[in-house]
């Protein structure tokens, strides 16, 4: 198939008739003036002629009897009769039409006809006798030809181009035979298509035999016909492989042939003007003279924007496409029709959502291309800015009241169905935090418009067309509704993006947000926001202000969030709940609302308990703002952690419960939205005291000893860390506890610098209890940067706050997931001590010390009692939550200070050994203060715990290497189990396979062994796959791939694992190189002589044993000696002791006689 030879195949009716291939039955005459051209093409198209001319010959003569006889006819061949010997080439007298199915050469004028025969030829194959066709040719569907045709250069209308022999459509001639009367239609199509510019055959036309039959049969005379295109079609009839590719689109074209009979045929009869067709091509926005392969896609894309939108214009475009693009129009138009059908449900769903969500349609009209999200909001700005004056404040309020009520009723009426539709097209409506200049708003309806613009960004063409179907009244209503809802704020369409691009461009980017939108559309929990509105309305419906209450709650959100936004943006979103809201727009407030009743002891603490699961970006939710209230709905680890904290502060809670339960009684009766409003109110207070950050920056110089001390405490008693963190993160739930925490922090800081912190702590005591969490976040920063790098204190405050807020969110989640494990580590002291610094738990062990170094040193001692009570119960849950900690910790380190990451990791690796040397000045002070605050019970326990746990860290500092110890300890259990045959099956498999491999290497080369093993594995897997396939076919079950579980399992080697082993191996390699250098360069003569003696002994060993033999012996010894030693340890130790004693005695005698050795020994 000469796809590359398209240029040589371009011919007209006059200058390139086919060369005479060996004729079998008929004698054909070629045009004398074109014999030179035929000779040029003889080598390339010899095989093509055989099949293509056969097609022409087999046509019945009745249909073409009226055709005028051309002066010179192109040669025709017939392969249907193999018994006829081939006739000599060259001009031959015309053969009489003996057979009815054969076509006399005098009835066809191949040279004079247009090369655009393939449409006619397409009709013929279905009518050809099937026995004449080669057996390998299956009937080929006509559909895929435009897609599979090789690209041909555009040709002028005057010089139509021949189809390449590689065209897929040529297989269409292998279709089964049918009745004769179709021949006139083919001839007529040949006549009419002669002057079409894009003469690559249209698969669509090839599939219209019945349509063409009516129109073509009525024509009295036929124009001269050319065999050029038939030549290629007949040739490719053999290509069954090509035919298989068209099977998928055959039904599409058949459908097109049924739907558009008149449009597909009449244009070919009536339109012959090439110039007009070229003009129509340009109008339709696609070059139909271009490559047939690309035309279908181009036509679908371009006509989709013109055809789908206007139904009345679709008919005209279909006609024009079918008329002036005979090759492509049927297939592509059918595709357009089908795409329109496919898009119609999405259109209706989108329109339904727009009616329900009151989204501005014009925004999606203009924003129809893939651009960053900022473009969408800018487009909205242009719309909203011009319409800011349209609505007055009172009208806005009343309309929003009405709309909220209607939306709630509509949401209730539609139920799950409407919610599921919302999930497909846009996010649920949720109150969002938006900023307009100095004012901040939280609106419920603006987010749907934002998400719909996002949807327009994802599906530009679809959104573009659906919006055009709307009437002007709907557009006006939707625009007004959105203007009213957004309160004339141009940025309210997507405040999250605005805020993100304003203040946190490095934290959440538009790429992430595109993922957010797609992921949330798929995974959004159903019914949260509708429930929010429904319950708000239902709870207040009995009162006269039913809809007004729902709106007022929103206004409450709006008003209370103004100060929040003003403080959030400069401080880089230090409030985790709102930062989560920006990262994951939809789930945040629903989670707040759902969690608020559970944590109603302090309304401001239930912000984001269930957020990590709902967060598409997987940003860990902060625990610092979560409440401690122990509810069965909370996650089990969280319950247990809360139970720990509750056990600790039983005595404290007796004092605090009256106040907190009063708050709970008030909050529980309020609707969810009001609780959420109160949550936001409380969080506003927590974001305000930014001056304290500068306060901690001032006392940074006093804190260098404090982090060290706390690191020491972490080393000595790991269990204190999570409790310490949790005391700051979750105890804020109880107001008294928070005030006590403030007192504790105040006292501990006063010990360091009384004058600096006195004024600040007065502010903290007067502020809301929730405020404690914020200073905690801020207080974390100086310690972190001091321990990291002294120069980091010079970083601007805003920058530090941004990184701290992000890092603390993730870090708190890490602590939240690992609190139980950390609190239970006292029982597993030896195990946890063996963990090196690369372990996730180790990171958390080290890291909280930076967090709580300044203000939490007393609290970690006061909370030791908590961990003592709960460590037994939490061992299991803590161990289970170990894997969860890896990701948050890694995220926190990568996101918080990427520049200093290496430095921090080094600091972690060395902290165990370095921190223990710090003098214990502050531990006593903080223990004393904790005694003052918490009671007499705490001090003895703290001091005792400190005394007990200080020694292990002192002794372990020498044993801690970077990661060698970790790798050894992590793999120690599995290796020991293997060597000691704990699991006989597992050990047997490993030992047997290793021994078999080594024994095989003794017989075969390593290449042969590898090849044999691979073949054996392949034979097993292939046989099993075939066996399972047969079983499934017999049982008619659909179990899928038998190895699907293994194929989908994660086999990638983690970077941490590689680093761990590489670091361990690097240490061994370096030590070996140093030792060898010392031995070979005779740093010590005695050691070099010993090494020489060892090598001399190895010469005899090598003469007796091969290397593989030694490896086999070593393997056998490795799996046998440990078991033998375990069973006979006492006897072996006795004899080994005797042997060692004798060896030492012998060495002592030798050293006594040799002065150099004696000196070395001394």
Curated annotation (Swiss-Prot):
GO BP, one example?
A: negative regulation of formation of growth cone in injured axon
The UniProt record lists the Reticulon domain at 975-1162
Claim: Endoplasmic reticulum is one of the keywords in the record: yes
Q: Name one GO molecular function term.
A: ubiquitin protein ligase binding
The biased composition feature labelled Low complexity covers 7-16, 109-127
Which InterPro entries does the record associate with it? Reticulon (IPR003388), RTN1-4 (IPR046964)
Question: What induces it, per record?
Answer: Isoform C: expression is induced by hypoxic treatments or myocardial infarction. Isoform C: is negatively regulated by the microRNA miR-182. Isoform B: expression is down-regulated by LPS in alveolar epithelium. Isoform B: induced during tissue ischemia. Isoform B2: induced during tissue ischemia.
Q: Which UniProt keywords apply?
A: Acetylation, Cell junction, Cell membrane, Endoplasmic reticulum, Membrane, Neurogenesis, Phosphoprotein, Synapse, Transmembrane, Transmembrane helix
Bias-annotated ranges (Basic and acidic residues): 408-422
Pfam families registered for this protein in UniProt = Reticulon
Its transmembrane ranges are 989-1009, 1079-1099
Ranges of the Cytoplasmic topological domain: 1-988, 1100-1162
* Compositionally biased intervals (Pro residues): 85-99
Q: Which residues carry this modification: N-acetylmethionine?
A: 1
- Positions of the UniProt region annotated as Disordered: 1-183, 408-432, 711-730
Q: Biased composition, Acidic residues: where in the chain?
A: 31-54, 713-730
Residues bearing N6-acetyllysine are: 1074
Please list the residues that carry the modification Phosphoserine. Answer: 7, 16, 105, 145, 165, 167, 329, 344, 426, 489, 690, 727, 768, 832, 857, 961
The record's statement on gene disruption is: Isoform A mutant embryos show defects in the development of fore- and hindlimb innervation. Increased fasciculation and decreased branching of nerves innervating fore- and hindlimbs seen. Disturbances of the radial migration pattern of neuronal precursor cells seen in embryonic cortex. Isoform A mutants show increased density of blood vessels in postnatal brain, which is lost in adult brain. Knockout mice for isoforms A and B are markedly hypotensive compared to control mice, with no significant increase of heart rate. They have mesenteric arteries thinner than controls.
Q: Which residues lie on this side of the membrane: Lumenal?
A: 1010-1078
GO-annotated cellular components: anchoring junction; axon; cell junction; cell projection; dendritic growth cone; endoplasmic reticulum; endoplasmic reticulum membrane; endoplasmic reticulum tubular network membrane
- Which residues are modified to Phosphothreonine? 348, 430, 834
Q: Does the keyword Nuclease apply?
A: no
Described by its record, this protein's role is as follows:
Required to induce the formation and stabilization of endoplasmic reticulum (ER) tubules. They regulate membrane morphogenesis in the ER by promoting tubular ER production. They influence nuclear envelope expansion, nuclear pore complex formation and proper localization of inner nuclear membrane proteins. However each isoform have specific functions mainly depending on their tissue expression specificities.
Partners and quaternary state?
A: Binds to RTN4R. Interacts with ATL1. Interacts with TMEM170A. Interacts with RTN4IP1.
Q: What is this protein called?
A: Reticulon-4
Give the source species. Answer: Mus musculus (Mouse)
